[in-house]
Amino acid sequence: MRRTGVMLARPFDAKRLAKWPKPYILQPKINGRRARVIFGTLGNPMIMSSEGHIINSLPTLTASLKGLGLKEIILDGELYVHGWTKQEIDRVVGRSVTIHKREAEMQYHVFDLINGFPQSQRREMLYWLRLEQTSTGVIPVPSVDADSLEEDLEHWLAAGYEGLIIRHKDGLYQPCNEKARSDYLMKLKPRKLGVFPIIGKLEEESIYKEPKDALGAFLCSHEGQRFKVGTGFTRADRERFWENEFKCRNYLAEILYQELSERGVPIFPVFKRLVAKE
């Protein structure tokens, strides 16, 4: 069914990103049920799906939203519980006759406001709502300013999210009924998986380029081209890998990535695991 009233992200495009001003606004990409919450003049919340249907299956969450005391404002987010599958979420949210026994566990993760202000101002307005301090089950999605994507992509993938949302700091809210896919919003979800030979390791450095006696990244190769990939290891494991003799030639790195670059190396590589050569 066609969606309406919400802003939809374009697939990641490096050329488009290169035209955007820095810093970018980054958020984890969550895989829930998209929904707006519309507060009227009396402060009564209405949860509306991205297809324009009112959701009445979540009385506990609706009460929490009413407790926010908001009026004449529209929140944009997803009905979501971290660690639940999309099917589990749909089973709870999609009830139309009876209430699911786990409806009280459902949360609303808020990532934007719907109004006429630029993205950076919308984020500031959302911050001052102090949602995390006023209501149970209403959770602001974290956001960071960044000049590059790799570190945050790796962090949020490791935390169990499906990728990154990248926001143009000056972008206006463009509902999909006005613009099919927003010019100011992109999603990055690495989908390709491959194994690559490890040919070396690089030492971790401080921001002042001082060595830290720990593994910083593996050096890998593909078709004669070298590239590096972080590991996501704990500090203790990074120190252990650096101090101990690690025979790189005996292992491959399994890597999740967006696509191969023109020179044949993975774009936005994310380390998954070590694979012993047979």
Task: Identify the function of each model-found stretch.
Residues 1-21, 25:
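Conserved, charged/glycine-enriched, solvent-exposed linker/hinge segments
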Residues 16-136, 277-278:
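Covalent nucleotidyltransferase
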Residues 17-20, 27-31, 158, 190-192, ...:
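A short catalytic or substrate-binding loop motif that flags glycine-/basic-rich loops and adjacent residues
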Residues 28, 71-82, 168, 200, ...:
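Flexible glycine-rich surface loops and low-complexity tracts that mediate binding to linear polymers
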Residues 44, 206-219:
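Short aromatic-glycine-enriched beta-strand elements
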Residues 89-103, 107-108, 115, 226-228, ...:
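Intrinsically disordered, low-complexity regulatory tails
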Residues 140-195, 203:
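Amphipathic alpha-helical
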Residues 217-222, 228-230:
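Short, acidic/hydrophobic/Gly-rich beta-strand patch recurrent on exposed beta strands
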